[in-house]
Amino acid sequence: MKRILLLLLLCSTTLLMAQQTDPIQEAMASYDYETALSLIAQKKPATPLLLQKGKALRSLGLNAEALSTYQEIIGKDSTNTRALIEAAECCRTLAKYKQASAYYEKVLDLTPENKYVRIQYINLLLAQQKFREALGES
């Protein structure tokens, strides 16, 4: 009987802990990016927080600021594929196609099997009318 009671107590504690959500995550999930940014600003910048900051900035249409955030991450870890992909997307939106290509190429060097990045890179090449290069990538 003690074992069953202990097991129930542990299960309920685990469930209660799982229900606690991070206010930043909650703001991001609610598309309240301004609140998320203000909460992120109060914390010590770490890669996961900077990724969230970049996402919030991009969602608000602040692509130049988002690019700076992703570049900060890349400066600390040049193999962070998520930051590289997001930086490429920001560059593409800002019509910095040469820089976007460089980011996509870096990701493809790190993860050649990444189909999403390959497709985005091919689309970028096609948009620039670099048909031979795009054909070589497909």
Predicted regions and their residues:
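Canonical tetratricopeptide repeat
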Residues: 52, 86, 120-123
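Register position in tetratricopeptide repeats
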Residues: 29, 59-60, 93-94, 127-128
